[in-house]
Amino acid sequence: MAVKIKLKRLGKIRSPHYRIVVADSRTRRDGRAIEEIGLYHPVQNPSRIEVNSERAQYWLSVGAQPTEPVLAILKLTGDWQAHKGLPAPAPLLQPEPKADKRALFEALSSDGDEAKGEAITPKAKKSDKKADEAAEASASTESTEA
């Protein structure tokens, strides 16, 4: 039985998520898998890649052939180099930790407690043009009546 390590697509339209699976080469893309050894989320920045290195090494050692996309992922994680005995690549980029929303809220709310002065510029008053036009219109109606 020929075994392949391939990607199994999950997710919605235009929002792909993949699982890295070991499956018989004759099964369809999203068909039954022998084992799931990782996941790949390409939409996130940087892409989320998680591979169970121990299981990937096992399946590579017993002859499982990775597909081209999985081979690229295994090279990024360093599992392919470990299998072939090559030097390891640079570590993967990790996403920045998200800021604590509660601490951010408290910091902003403490800044808002300070009394702030009134507006520097006064409110704009209605323009004198509109008042002049209204006066001219009423004057012209009075002159035509006389």
From Swiss-Prot:
Superkingdom, taxonomy of origin: Bacteria
Keywords tagged on the record: Ribonucleoprotein, Ribosomal protein
Bias kind Low complexity: ranges: 136-146
Record-linked InterPro entries: Ribosomal_bS16, Ribosomal_bS16_CS, Ribosomal_bS16_dom_sf
One GO term (biological process): translation
GO MF: structural constituent of ribosome
Stored Gene3D superfamilies: 3.30.1320.10
Stretches for region Disordered: 84-146
UniProt keyword Ribonucleoprotein present: yes
Keyword RNA-binding carried by entry: no
GO CC terms, sorted: cytoplasm; small ribosomal subunit
NCBIfam families: PRK14520.1, S16
Family note: Belongs to the bacterial ribosomal protein bS16 family.
HAMAP family documented for this protein: Ribosomal_bS16
Protein name: Small ribosomal subunit protein bS16
